[in-house]
Regions:
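Transmembrane helix interruption/hinge and helix-loop junction motifs
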Residues: 5-13
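Hydrophobic, membrane-inserted alpha-helices
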Residues: 1-3
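Cytosolic/stromal cytosol-facing helical appendages immediately following the last transmembrane segment
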Residues: 15, 21-134
Length: 134
């Protein structure tokens, strides 16, 4: 309603376009943050249930969303208090590079993540999570 009063139908179209882009971006990031990881239903969310990265540019531009594992550990912390976690699964690149691959080259992203998923299974997954994967 506000968009229409401010800019007419053009404002409404812009509002809808921005909303669609924002939703696509949010879901792409969510997909990337949890890609291929499993958790036993009802078990607590832990550090190893999301991908982490400590790339400086991504951290600055995306308000530390790169410290996603710490957010899983302590969801109520403000973004500026999120710290890198050494014992969390690590993305091969920063969020911005990885997101570009997810959106435009999904087959390349999957191939790039295969060794990371094997490492996760061998070093982070619980026995129950390994059984879910098998």
């Amino acid at each position: 309603m506000v968009a229409f009063f401010l800019a007419g139908w053009y404002g409404v179209l812009m509002f809808i376009g921005i909303a669609i882009f924002a939703k696509f971006f949010l879901e792409s990031v969510n997909y990337m943050e949890h890609y291929g990881l499993v958790r036993i239903k009802g078990s607590p969310v832990e550090l190893h249930h999301s991908w982490n990265t400590n790339r400086r540019i991504s951290s600055i531009l995306l308000y530390n969303v790169t410290r996603h594992s710490h957010h899983h550990e302590q969801g109520s912390l403000e973004f500026w208090k999120l710290k890198p976690k050494e014992n969390a699964p690590e993305m091969p690149y920063g969020y911005l590079t990885t997101l570009y691959l997810v959106v435009f080259f999904p087959w390349l992203y999957r191939r790039m993540m295969e060794p990371k998923l094997e490492h996760w299974k061998d070093h982070f997954a619980s026995e129950g999570e390994r059984q879910l994967i098998a």
